[in-house]
Amino acid sequence: MTTHFMRSYAELCIKTCHRRNIHAMGGMAAQIPVKNDEKANAEAFARVKADKEREATYGHDGTWVAHPGMVELAKEAFDRLMPTPNQIALKKRDDVKVSAADLLRFEPEAPITEAGLRLNINVAIQYIGAWLAGQGAVPIYNLMEDAATAEISRSQVWQWIRSSKGKLDDGRTVSKAMVAAMIPEEMSKIRQLLGSAFGEGRYEEASVIFADLVNNDNFVEFLTLPAYERID
């Protein structure tokens, strides 16, 4: 949320809402408590704390979290930084001057990496596989994910394949062939990660859907459209 276009839309949202005297809600913190890993758990709580402090400082009037275990942390941040019921009158954000160009400034802060490409493939397949089996919210790598995550993942891969800037930091070009080679490798990782739970999802079907989505030269509007066709 600190990249240029994301901060721009967040602050514009606050300004727009407060001009109309309505509440500007912050976003969801996807982190969830991590069992049996004290360091990872502490990192998750630290990320949520920083996220909610940023939202309250920007001028949001409330927020939400993905897990009830994070409610008290979010509440503490807002109670401390927003002692009033809301910030509608206090932070009109007339200082915010956001243009269309600001909202379209998507320059990445870091290069595309093989690890990032693989993570997009892995997470998208995990989510779609669980979605086909009836789950809408899916814990993946200590984050509570919904369809938006899989949408971002498959959209980035689709774009990297077709963009002249779709190159990894080592100079290799992201291609359909590269992604096709990585899909079975990531499937093996998912199978190993989930163990017996692998059979509870529909991951083989998910990998086919993902491959079809990124290989289709016409960008499919929503990944759930072809996925719905596989639901009885």
Report each predicted region and the residues it spans.
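Expand to "…catalyze enediolate/carbanion chemistry for C-C bond making/breaking, isomerization
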Residues: 1-232
